[in-house]
């Protein structure tokens, strides 16, 4: 099977449609379909911050309904899940934009979306191992010694948030270790979560979160080709939201 794995979308629905078209997909019955039978996959965080979180998430619902969804949920997916289940959540760091979209829905449509999103999230795997273990899709990455282990808080934390140090940056974001530099595994790991200006290949990993919602690009990596395909963002560029590694 050949895959086109798409980075963090964050509500940038128009850019997603452009990228799918660039990759050769057509919308058939509202489902992205490739003439050569390729499959799309996602590193998560379809929602929050951008202009069209609900449209983007509803596309994931349709893919799931068709049995065609490969989607590693990210920290924003998890936060929205907890909020919609009634947990007390601070409406900041992006979720407030999705909540604002929800508030514009009719009561009936809002109730339906909440129910459908909870079902959507409950059905997801934390990360995906494909092509007989040669390909791993995990939102913020995964350390080699965690691959194939049973569910744990350590595994969940790493896949959702990355290799956090416990310290924070001045803007409140967590400080993370560059885990990919230490990775020596055989599986090719595709991840996102940390915005970089260009897809970043390190050892046998690639970060494809190229900060579309911050004015960068929406990026896909084709597997097994390891070819990068990107679409420029339609959003304003915010330079300080991108991580630059030494």
List the predicted regions and their residue ranges.
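Acidic, His/Gly-rich catalytic cores of divalent-metal-dependent hydrolytic chemistry
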Residues: 157-246
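Active-site environment of divalent metal-dependent phosphoester hydrolases
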Residues: 12-14, 48-51, 78-81, 144-145, ...
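Divalent-metal (often Zn2+) His-rich catalytic cores of metallo-beta-lactamase-fold enzymes
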Residues: 135-155
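Residue-level marker for buried hydrophobic side chains located in beta-strands
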Residues: 5, 40-42, 71-72, 136, ...
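Active-site neighborhood of divalent metal-dependent phosphoester bond hydrolases
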Residues: 34-37, 49-129, 133, 157-158, ...
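Divalent metal-coordination and catalytic microenvironments
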Residues: 8, 45, 60, 74-75, ...
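N-terminal active-site segment of His-dependent metallophosphoesterases
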Residues: 1-57
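Beta-strand-turn-beta hairpins that frame and shape the catalytic cleft
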Residues: 1-4, 129-136
């Amino acid at each position: 099977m050949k895959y086109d794995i798409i980075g963090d979308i964050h509500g940038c629905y128009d850019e997603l449609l452009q990228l799918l078209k660039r990759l050769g997909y057509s919308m058939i019955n509202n489902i992205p379909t490739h003439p050569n039978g390729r499959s799309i996959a996602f590193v998560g965080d379809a929602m929050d911050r951008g202009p069209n979180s609900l449209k983007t998430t509803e596309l994931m619902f349709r893919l799931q309904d068709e049995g065609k969804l490969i989607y590693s949920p990210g920290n924003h997916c998890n936060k929205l899940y907890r909020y919609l289940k009634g947990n007390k959540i601070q409406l900041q760091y992006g979720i407030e934009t999705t909540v604002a979209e929800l508030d514009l829905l009719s009561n009936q449509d809002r109730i339906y979306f909440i129910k459908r999103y909870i079902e959507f999230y409950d059905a997801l795997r934390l990360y995906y191992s494909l092509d007989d273990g040669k390909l791993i899709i995990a939102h913020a990455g995964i350390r080699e010694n965690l691959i194939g282990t049973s569910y744990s808080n350590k595994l969940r934390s790493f896949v959702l948030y990355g290799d956090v140090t416990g310290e924070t940056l001045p803007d409140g974001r967590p400080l993370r270790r560059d885990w990919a530099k230490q990775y020596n595994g055989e599986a090719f790991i595709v991840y996102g979560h940390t915005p970089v200006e260009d897809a970043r290949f390190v050892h046998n990993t690639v970060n494809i979160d190229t900060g579309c919602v911050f004015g960068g690009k929406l990026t896909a990596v084709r597997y097994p080709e390891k070819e990068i395909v990107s679409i420029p963002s339609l959003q304003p560029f915010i330079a300080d939201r991108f991580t630059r590694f030494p």
